[in-house]
Amino acid sequence: MMDWATLPKDLLDLISKCLESSFDLIQFRSVCSSWRSAAGPKRLLWAHNLPFFPSDDKPFLSNVILRVAHQSILLIKPNEPQCEADLFGWIVKVWDNIYVSRKMTLLKPLSSSRNYFPQHLPRIFDMSKFTVRELCREVKLYHPDYYCVPGHTALELELGKTVVKYLNDDKFVLLTILEYGKLAVFRSWDREWTVINDYIPSRCQDLIMFDGRFFAIDYNGRTVVVDYSSFKLTLAANPLIGGGDKKFLIESCGEMFLVDIEFCLNEKPEFTGGFYSYFNETTVSYKFKFFKLVEREKRWVEVEDLGDKMFFLGDDSTFSASTADIIPRCVGTGSFVFFYTHEESLVVMDDRNLGVFDFRSGKTELVNKLPEYAKLFWPPPPWITTSHESVENYTGETSSQSQS
């Protein structure tokens, strides 16, 4: 029988460099001491301060610093399911706090707000007891003293979605959405932000790193490739005809998709399917359309079937997964989209709720009304909360450890 502990160190080093997920690397290094010594921890590129964006009308921000948070969205399952309920995974976002060794903060998976986790949630997770799959990695700009700029509100420090491209171990590029929908690029070797002044007809709504390139889409559906070397924009897809109010770019199986959501305001519900958010006498419903990018034709082509996929639309990232990987087949199959119902431009809504759209039925519902989907997010499953010691006054911070 092969003694895996005796594999050549250079081969182990080569394998470890192919592991993009930090959690895969943790499990790799936990196999034995020789594997641990052969594969060092991943180097983080953002353990330093970044300047704030150029701002002529807000000079008080010139002394504000930014940092980049690394966040991972995980699907966690028990290694040995004991019952049918254990076949459901738990989807959670973790913020890897690089300033405190091996300490992480648990967040809501489609936003960056903390969840109020139960007191008996464990403070320490032994990752060797679970199957951990990283569904998505995202970066988020933040200000360490977000609420501590004298005389100014947190709203003035609102930071948009950010995506990253790594060039090598020492160089990286960030693309972010600024206030009023403009784009800005940060190149690590420049140590400064460059605002892109190329023509954008309407404000940018979403960003994505796809096929090694930065893509951005505006309110009308016009999609461009952002060149971080020349700071020029190249048309990738023409605007949609009669598009909706909110657009998300998402990669799935090597292709780029567009999810276009239309918000419908009515005095009385006019749709037989879906759910409605009420504000006084006004109701809000949602219409979804899905498109696939055909770049050679510079257009978005509407699709009628997503296959057996789940789309997740978050504040700081979008990602997809096979439905069969997320929920047991005994519960159901099909295509689903998880999204937050609140949108800044939709002033009639005063709270954020997680919704799910069923592609095949065309119906939308609140996740908390569907137990088979709600258990993916909240509360934490019993096999998490009962396998460790209770912790009082738990704030959402935890540590990870692996056995070696």
From Swiss-Prot:
Coiled coil: none annotated. It comes from the Eukaryota. It holds the Pfam family Beta-prop_KIB1-4. InterPro entries: F-box_dom, KIB1-4_b-propeller, SCF_F-box_domain. Residues 2-50 form the F-box domain. This is F-box protein At2g17036. It comes from Arabidopsis thaliana.
